[in-house]
Structure formats: structure tokens, C-alpha cells
């Protein structure tokens, strides 16, 4: 269940970012989003043997674990389409945090599709312990969870520090990172389909070309990561203090000064619009 729980904080951040950047007070299908996360969390406990399709389970067991694993894709898909429905009808503002969110939705979907493919026990017998699995879980983790973390960081950095990062550099950094991670992990689908196994330190020469491209992508990602650190450093050095936030006040946290002062409220704030 660990990997399904791992993505839940990311889901929450993406919901916050997308609803706020859309200028809406909540996501589409707010209650359905909550039930979807509960369903993902609960189903995560009854699908463990999808890691064990190659150990010789009988056909009924394989059929069950294939089906149960695929059912996890349903609430996940509900979340994806609810985010898209939240964006519907708004003029999309391609701010850095919005770019990270859109990148998250797209790449997490790609990782989810390869996950549905791997859920098939008959196919998984061939693909088990190949780089296809590595490509799958890096699309949902290195481009799902990490993109959510990056999106959350650039979105709430002004709230935590009261300083602005350079949005132009942030966009350059996003696209550099996007190209880097895709160049790293997309060829691994091909390596897996060609039968390259996981957890070996060396490989036959036939796999060299895709591995070179994958390595090039990792260098690009490294450059993008260093660029991000440089952007944070530049922000802290130049101290561009935010005087007039342009945020839609769909959330109470943006009403205060940035960063919020101690004892901001004389009384408990009233919650409305459930």
C-alpha cells in the first residue's frame, strides 16, 4: 500500500493549486475526490500479489489480483478527470505552479496507463523485473510525486517566505526538467519491451543506444535541479518582497501578509461555503 499512500499528499497539493489557479473555490466533484482518495487507500491493501505474478499462483488468484489492481485505476481516473473539469471554462494562466500541475496530470496519467498494462498477469509474466516496470513507477513517482512536490514548493514559496522567485527562470527550469525526466524514463519502456532486466550492473550491447539517451536525460535533469537551487538562491539574495499578491482569495491562507504574521486573527475565522 505504501506507493498508493505516497501520492496522496501530492494529490491534495495538486487539487489546491489547480482550484486556486482556476479561480474557483473548490475542485470539481469535491466529495467525489475525497471518496476517490479513500478508495485508493483501501484498495491498496488488497492488491499486494500483483508483484508476484511470476511465482506460480493459480489462475483464479491471478484473475482476482489483476482485476483488483485495475480497479485502483478507476478512482485515480476520477481524480484526473475532476482536475480537468476544474480547469474547464477558465482561461488557463501558465504560471510556474500551473505548469507543474499540468505536467503532473499528464505524466501521472502516462504512468497510470503503463500500470494498467502491468496489472494484466499474463503480460506481467513477460514484463516482470524488466525496465518496463522501472519506467512505470518512475512516471508515477519521479514525475507524479516529484512534480507535485515541485509544484507545491513554487506555489507556496511566496507564502512561506514573502519573496518572489523569478517566474521566467522558473518556466525555463520546468521545461528543462520536463525534457530531462522524459528523455531519461521514456526509453526505458523500449528497453523493458526488449527484455532488459532490472538490477543488473551491466547489459548486452544491443541496449546501449537507449541507455545512452536515458543517461543524457539524467544529465539534463541534474542541470535542471541545479538551476532550481540557483533560482531559490537568487530569490533569497535579491529579496523581491511581495507587496500586492494577485492571488484569487479562494483560500483563507492568502488573506494575510506574506509571510503571515504571528497572531493574525483576533478571533477564530468563520468557515463557510462547504
UniProtKB/Swiss-Prot annotation:
- Keywords, in A-Z order: Copper, Electron transport, Heme, Iron, Magnesium, Membrane, Metal-binding, Mitochondrion, Mitochondrion inner membrane, Respiratory chain, Translocase, Transmembrane, Transmembrane helix, Transport
What topology in the membrane does the UniProt record assign? Multi-pass membrane protein
Keyword ATP-binding recorded: no
Which residues participate in Mg(2+) binding? 128-129
Residue sites binding Cu cation per the record = 50-51
Q: Which Enzyme Commission number(s) are on file for it?
A: 7.1.1.9
Q: What GO biological process terms does the UniProt entry carry, in alphabetical order?
A: electron transport coupled proton transport; mitochondrial electron transport, cytochrome c to oxygen
Recite the UniProt cofactor note for this protein.
Binds 2 heme A groups non-covalently per subunit.
SUPFAM superfamilies in the record: Cytochrome c oxidase subunit I-like (SSF81442)
- Report whether Secreted shows up as a keyword of the record: no
Q: What terms describe the molecular function in GO for this protein? A: cytochrome-c oxidase activity; heme binding; metal ion binding
Q: In which pathway does it act?
A: Energy metabolism; oxidative phosphorylation
Membrane-spanning residues? 28-48, 65-85, 98-118, 140-160, 174-194, 212-232
Catalyses which reaction?
4 Fe(II)-[cytochrome c] + O2 + 8 H(+)(in) = 4 Fe(III)-[cytochrome c] + 2 H2O + 4 H(+)(out)
**Class of the enzyme per the UniProt entry, highest EC level:** translocase
Q: List the coiled-coil residues.
A: none
In terms of InterPro entries, this protein maps to: Cyt_c_oxase-like_su1_dom, Cyt_c_oxase-like_su1_sf, Cyt_C_Oxase_1
* Major location (coarse): mitochondrion
Q: Which residues bind heme a3?
A: 136
An annotated GO cellular component of this protein is: mitochondrial inner membrane
Q: Which PANTHER family match?
A: CYTOCHROME C OXIDASE SUBUNIT 1
This chain's function reads: Component of the cytochrome c oxidase, the last enzyme in the mitochondrial electron transport chain which drives oxidative phosphorylation. The respiratory chain contains 3 multisubunit complexes succinate dehydrogenase (complex II, CII), ubiquinol-cytochrome c oxidoreductase (cytochrome b-c1 complex, complex III, CIII) and cytochrome c oxidase (complex IV, CIV), that cooperate to transfer electrons derived from NADH and succinate to molecular oxygen, creating an electrochemical gradient over the inner membrane that drives transmembrane transport and the ATP synthase.
Record-stated family = Belongs to the heme-copper respiratory oxidase family.
Relate the assembly described in the record: Component of the cytochrome c oxidase (complex IV, CIV), a multisubunit enzyme composed of a catalytic core of 3 subunits and several supernumerary subunits. The complex exists as a monomer or a dimer and forms supercomplexes (SCs) in the inner mitochondrial membrane with ubiquinol-cytochrome c oxidoreductase (cytochrome b-c1 complex, complex III, CIII).
Any idea what this protein is called? Cytochrome c oxidase subunit 1
Q: Which organism is it from?
A: Choristoneura rosaceana
Gene encoding the protein: COI
